[in-house]
Amino acid sequence: MTAEIQYPLFRVFVGPDRTITICGSQIFTLNSQSGAVETLATVSSAEKNVSSVIRIGAVDEAYQHLVTSGDDKRLRVWSIHDLKELSCREIPKRANVLKLSQDGQTILVADKFGDIFSYPLVPPESTLQPQSTENTGSKSLAVAMHDNPHGTLILGHASIITDFVLTHGEKQVISADRDEHVRVSWYPEGWDVDQYCLGHKMFVSALEIPACAPSILVSGGGDPELYVWEYKTGKNMARIPIWNHIQPFLKVKGGRRKPEKPQGKKSKKKKAVVESEDVDMVTESGEEFLVVSKLKQVRFGQVDVVLFFAVGCSALFYFRWPVSLDFGGVEVCSLDLANPVLDFAVVQDGKVLVSVDPTWPTTPGAVSTTPSTDSRRVRRLVWKDGQVVEDESESPLVQSLNQGCDVKGPANETHTLGLYEPLFALPKTAEFESGDGAEDTPVPQDITSGPGLRASARQKTKEELEKRKALTQEATQRATKQPRVEET
């Protein structure tokens, strides 16, 4: 019988009154001062044989609402104070990135299809009505075609969107994808592209606009450097080398994802080179890959610092933000935490809580199968003497996160949590370079299944964007066009 182990905390959000943590399909709220666990909620998948594990989450700035999504393609909104599920909406494709607008009233979702949709926090009543069971074939086709009557299409990429950020005035949205692109578009008129930040050689997986420098963008992904941009002009200001700092701390190696070869007789038709939840994939682990997962500018007293980590890496990295914007002298530092970092959250008192994975030796691609000697799932860090160091004292909240919030499962099933999925999903192979669905894919007349359906759906997205653009241009021709107000 397989032994059970305590699963790690995938996401942590620390608010002034309540802290939220996500583990598998369970959500916990804790009192941020006492650490007492106040509420527990469990997500159940609406479909058979579909995982109920929560993959992504986001909270509003006021810490009133939590938004989550997972493999079941449901967008759930929760009330933080009692973890009541306020709404549950079906979305066309699995969500990849979730963000909330500054006022907390709009949810922005980037999906595996390469599009960003916006949804109102409180859905219209019609959205909550049960779906009719009649004509289920048409419904399935509509979902596959990426029809989304409940969401507003903002923009679309020809590749999976890996991250996006709204600028500090929410006048623009900056989006990145698996095909090395960083695009600056007007928001919410996302079809109106203002600028490109070009230069990455590999996928881009993390973006950050520092609050201390709102006209600058920092991006990272699979390249051995972080890129610093003047995003309004697309100018690359600097590149900060990071790979030599990260490589010694890699605990989980990545791999490449390829379409699974069909069993039995070989098909005469070439299998579609489309990476999605509609194609069976196999993974090959054992290669070192860099995937920058999160970038965040933090202020410690009077010092601005950029924190970041990489998937499968056991250290938290940081550098001081240069006031002079001279990045030539930037020194990248690291703090070894022994176990791979999963997430970090900034606490109001200037401390940082870091979630780590003590179960990593059980995951595919682990560099060692020897169990970790440190079972702590959360560490608290502080800024001291010009460095990020571990806090010598352990708060009641950290104690509760480490000892409570107990979610156990078989040791051989930690891979189902998807903690290291980007290490396998983002790198490309020569045979799979078009893995996200190229725009020039021919569209056959029969679009009821297979690659034709995917290509037709992408073409439909493009047509929808063009239609919106044409309507807007027509409207501006009938009225005096007002100049756009640039952000300062």
Describe each model-derived feature in a short phrase:
Residues 2-27, 52-56, 305-307:
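Beta-strand-rich domains and repeat architectures in extracellular enzymes and scaffolds
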Residues 3-4, 42-48, 88-91, 153-156, ...:
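Surface loop/turn motifs at the tips and blade-to-blade linkers of beta-strand repeat domains
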Residues 6-12, 48-58, 93-100, 155-166, ...:
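Canonical WD40 repeat/beta-propeller blade segments in eukaryotic WD-repeat proteins
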Residues 16-17, 62-64, 103-105, 169-171, ...:
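Short coil/turn segments that connect the beta-strands within blades of beta-propeller domains
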Residues 20, 67-68, 108, 174, ...:
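Structural core positions within WD40/WD-like beta-propeller blades
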Residues 23, 69-72, 110-113, 121, ...:
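Conserved strand-to-loop turn within each blade of WD40 beta-propeller repeats
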Residues 30-39, 77-87, 113-151, 169, ...:
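Per-blade loop-tip surfaces of WD-repeat and WD-like beta-propellers in eukaryotic adaptors/scaffolds
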Residues 135-139, 143, 235-488:
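Terminal intrinsically disordered, low-complexity extensions flanking WD-repeat/beta-propeller proteins
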